Amino acid sequence: MKRVAIVGLGMAVTPHAKSLLDLKDRVRVAYAYSPSAARRSQFAQRFGLPECDRLETILEDRSVDAVAVLTPPNTHLEIVERCAAAGKHVLLEKPLDVSTARAEKLVHSMNSKHLVLAVVLQNRHKPATKRLVQLLASGELGRLVAASAYVELWRPQSYYDQPGRGTKARDGGGVLLTQGIHTLDVLIALAGEPAEVKSFVTTTPVHRMETEDLVCAALRWDSRALGVVYATTSNYPGTPERIEIVAERGTATLAGTLAEIRWHDGRTERAGEEGTAGGAGADTMAFPHDYHRAVWSDFLDAIERKRAPLVSGAEALKVHRLIDRILQSGG
């Protein structure tokens, strides 16, 4: 039985708390911390889990095996470095931090202590994603021809009116680092990191915000495969993110929680679950917690078996670097 603590009790905590309650035969929540007394009280009343009012209480308790860091991105480096110094494994909400330089320092702090760092990029855990990864990695679909990602979401102005939302200082970026990171992470898992990126990046009249809410990018891989990235939070009312793969022996579409593979021999294969992952529209938390539970289960397995999680710090750095390249190309 592992003992864990939660740091950060804002919007992101709900799927994690539900996941931990589901996994109560494997893990026990020792503490839940927020500097806000109101958030601590609301969390304790809703989930019936113990709370504390000092981060030091968690770090000094040697019985705590791991910490879930669910705080704003610009706080991640400091908190994770303190967790590493205290010998705690960490499950970290995306992104790693607000810049790749800070993200690299964060990952090093955990690796240098031989601690497990798992990053919450839960779309990797979808059965549909895993099936497509398998088909491409095994060569069953043949050589990759094209790979594209479409992130067509809606966020009202009220979303960006929240303090720090969409700013470089707190979030590190806009649609790519906050929303598109999930789909781009899956794209890399399927196709690898592209060799060349050319892009356009802008902020539309739909939003008043510091960072980008619309990106169009062209990608080229060493294999000569091509692709595009289209990401926005201006697409009312929002549609599920999707990835389209063209390969030698078939074409695949991954949308929401379902993948459809159309083989050249006439077969059609479906993988995953019917429905949608949710979160495409104004209600950003309108999604099931199944894949967060899968992240937690994989994290616990990684600790117990002394192996890397599915999305380690090193894996998460790949998508950070791709986002940097897209933004730099777009000026």
List each model region and its residues.
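Predominantly a Rossmann-like dinucleotide-binding segment in NAD(P)-dependent oxidoreductases
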Residues: 123-208
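Active-site loop of classical SDR/Rossmann-like NAD(P)-dependent oxidoreductases
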Residues: 35, 283-297, 311
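C-terminal helix-rich "cap/oligomerization" subdomain common to oxidoreductases
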Residues: 66-69, 222, 298-331
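Beta-strand-loop-alpha-helix segment that lines the small-molecule cofactor/substrate pocket
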Residues: 66, 72-73, 77-124, 139
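Hydrophobic residues in well-ordered beta-strands that form the structural core
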Residues: 13, 53, 92-93, 117-119, ...
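N-terminal Rossmann-like dinucleotide-binding module
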Residues: 1-47
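Short acidic low-complexity segments
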Residues: 50-62
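Contiguous beta-strand/loop segments that form the cofactor/metal-binding neighborhood of enzyme cores
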Residues: 184-260, 293-307
